[in-house]
């Protein structure tokens, strides 16, 4: 069982941070200044700079990710954007990338093939999703069947057809 949030942590964050660190360095910030802006250690920025942190190609090549990196990099470097705004802008993009069929949904389906087998659209966080309703019904039917299997004498009531 792997949560979509794990996809964000394992695939998006290292990729996004390394792209943003590179953007900020290109704008003239020192490694320490980049570390301060990103809220990470200077050592982490050094790893981003030397390519020691793997990037997810699907995330790195997404135009929306690239646009956000450029916008946030420019805003943070110039002081026109606060760290809070950068965080919120990034969170908004993360939610968009979780949409059915989008980047995180595809990565999540690759890690949890059972999700790919489901033919409808769904949002993992939607408490009213069709997928969740279907899985709850499946579980309920399973509990009912198990209860019937263990009910004494029930088998004699079922006709042989």
Language-model features, listed with the residues they occupy:
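Short, Lys/Arg-enriched anionic-surface-contact patches
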Residues: 1-17
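Short, amphipathic alpha-helical "recognition" segments used to contact nucleic acids or chromatin
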Residues: 13-28
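Short, solvent-exposed alpha-helical "recognition" segments
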Residues: 15, 48-63
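DNA major-groove recognition helix of helix-turn-helix
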Residues: 25, 38, 49
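Short alpha-helical "recognition helix" segments of helix-turn-helix
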Residues: 31-36
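Key DNA-contacting residues within the recognition helix of helix-turn-helix
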Residues: 42, 46-47
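Short, basic, alpha-helical segments at the C-terminal edge of helix-turn-helix-like DNA-binding modules
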Residues: 62-71
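Helix-turn-helix/homeodomain-like alpha-helical modules used for DNA recognition
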Residues: 70-160
């Amino acid at each position: 069982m792997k949560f979509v949030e794990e996809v964000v942590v394992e695939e998006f964050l290292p990729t996004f941070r390394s792209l943003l660190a590179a953007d900020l360095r290109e704008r003239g910030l020192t490694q320490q200044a980049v570390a301060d802006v990103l809220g990470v250690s200077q050592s982490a920025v050094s790893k981003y700079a030397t390519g020691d942190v793997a990037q997810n190609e699907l995330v790195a090549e997404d135009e929306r990710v690239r646009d956000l990196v450029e916008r946030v990099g420019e805003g943070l470097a110039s002081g026109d954007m606060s760290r809070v705004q950068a965080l919120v802008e990034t969170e908004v993009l993360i939610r968009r990338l979780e949409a059915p069929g989008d980047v995180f949904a595809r990565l999540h389906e690759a890690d949890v093939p059972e999700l790919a087998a489901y033919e409808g659209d769904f949002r993992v966080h939607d408490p009213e999703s069709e997928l969740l309703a279907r899985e709850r019904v499946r579980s309920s039917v399973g509990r009912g069947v198990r209860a019937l299997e263990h009910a004494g004498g029930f088998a004699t009531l079922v006709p042989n057809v």
